[in-house]
Amino acid sequence: MISANFLINQLSKYGFNFFTGVPCSHLTSVINGVINSKKIKYIGATSEGEAVGIASGAWLAGKKSVVMIQNSGLGNTINPLTSLNHTFKIPILLITTWRGDPKIKDEPQHELMGKITRNILRLTKIKNEIFPIKENNLKKVLLKINNS
């Protein structure tokens, strides 16, 4: 398992210096880590779509942005991602937890969204990678997304 500190340090190495998102129990340690960081700015959002807007504004102001959300809120990001980010080529990194992953037993309310999450990303032309478990694989994924 990748620690929150390792993730934050790796993202910082690639220049990610602005984080936003909505609370998610699976991301608590990462959210707390960026809140407590002296190098990274964090602004909490009231909705996933708002987080995309905040991150996009930060990019326009010269920041490299990360949005942290649960996949159950992915639907709330579709309009800003397709109308704002796609149209104006505004890059942001989405860290999206995958509740309802068909390979992992989860709560019933996450079942449908878990099944369709990857399809939503594909249909909206959002490049995506499954979050790696090993630190070395995280470095490879970050190198890949940083060069795309």
Predicted regions and their residues:
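Thiamine diphosphate
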Residues: 1-148
